[in-house]
Amino acid sequence: MAATLLAARGAGPAPAWGPEAFTPDWESREVSTGTTIMAVQFDGGVVLGADSRTTTGSYIANRVTDKLTPIHDRIFCCRSGSAADTQAVADAVTYQLGFHSIELNEPPLVHTAASLFKEMCYRYREDLMAGIIIAGWDPQEGGQVYSVPMGGMMVRQSFAIGGSGSSYIYGYVDATYREGMTKEECLQFTANALALAMERDGSSGGVIRLAAIAESGVERQVLLGDQIPKFAVATLPPA
């Protein structure tokens, strides 16, 4: 049965006998944060959000992953793609940005952090599987959101979504987002969008992690299962 599953998943011809015939598919897959990530800009800061499911093939490797990674005091990134790739890139950018801040003797710009992600993702675009959203606050530009998808492009947006679950919520976010939302409205908007994606996307799930970044600092919160927004799901009537 396992051999049949491996062949069906495109892992090559199924071995007739031997240990490979009984190896589950997730043992040969890399750990992935196939996921839903999001960031929204408001007047005075940004809100970031992500689900917490990490998968290895069809196996859920971690239910409570933290995909909101601090890069500096008021700069965070949301990670999607290969867990190993995104963690390595985030660690490298954190290291470089720390030195840059020491040289300037002042907090780094969000644009600088996004540019470092862009340079690394573009330089190693053939080897990396990493889609990243960078968001934060700095004294020059205030709250900012940058998207760096796979391939190394960088674009500033009022809001950004990414990951496997994002394809299910483009219609919702386009119809719901409006300029001038408050921090509380952005938090609710982000939580609703993530909940909708987690309902439909098998690679997204767990809890919802949120972060609000402003001049005053970073406020983080976690929405557990009974706190996640609920939406009606279409079902067939009973026979």
UniProtKB/Swiss-Prot annotation:
Q: Keyword rRNA-binding, does the record have it? A: no
Q: Which UniProt keywords apply?
A: Acetylation, Cytoplasm, Host-virus interaction, Hydrolase, Nucleus, Phosphoprotein, Protease, Proteasome, Threonine protease, Zymogen
Q: What would you give as a GO molecular function for this chain, any one?
A: cadherin binding
Question: Which positions carry Phosphothreonine?
Answer: 69
Q: PROSITE patterns, per this entry?
A: PROTEASOME_BETA_1 (PS00854), PROTEASOME_BETA_2 (PS51476)
Gene induction: Down-regulated by IFNG/IFN-gamma (at protein level). Up-regulated in anaplastic thyroid cancer cell lines.
Q: Which GO terms describe its cellular component?
A: cytoplasm; cytosol; extracellular exosome; mitochondrion; nucleoplasm; nucleus; proteasome complex; proteasome core complex
Gene3D superfamilies in alphabetical order: Glutamine Phosphoribosylpyrophosphate, subunit 1, domain 1 (3.60.20.10)
Q: Which residues of this protein are catalytic? A: 35 (nucleophile)
The GO biological-process annotations, alphabetized, read as: proteasome-mediated ubiquitin-dependent protein catabolic process
- Enzyme nomenclature, EC number: 3.4.25.1
Top-level taxon in the UniProt lineage: Eukaryota
What Pfam families does the database record attribute to this sequence? Answer: Proteasome
Which residues are annotated as modified residue N-acetylalanine in the UniProt record? 2
Subunit (UniProt):
The 26S proteasome consists of a 20S proteasome core and two 19S regulatory subunits. The 20S proteasome core is a barrel-shaped complex made of 28 subunits that are arranged in four stacked rings. The two outer rings are each formed by seven alpha subunits, and the two inner rings are formed by seven beta subunits. The proteolytic activity is exerted by three beta-subunits PSMB5, PSMB6 and PSMB7.
Function, as annotated: Component of the 20S core proteasome complex involved in the proteolytic degradation of most intracellular proteins. This complex plays numerous essential roles within the cell by associating with different regulatory particles. Associated with two 19S regulatory particles, forms the 26S proteasome and thus participates in the ATP-dependent degradation of ubiquitinated proteins.
Question: Known PANTHER family for this protein?
Answer: METALLOPROTEASE TLDD (PTHR32194), PROTEASOME SUBUNIT BETA (PTHR32194:SF14)
- Name the protein family: Belongs to the peptidase T1B family.
Full protein name: Proteasome subunit beta type-6
Task: Say which species the protein is native to.
Answer: Homo sapiens
Q: What is the lineage of its organism?
A: Eukaryota, Metazoa, Chordata, Craniata, Vertebrata
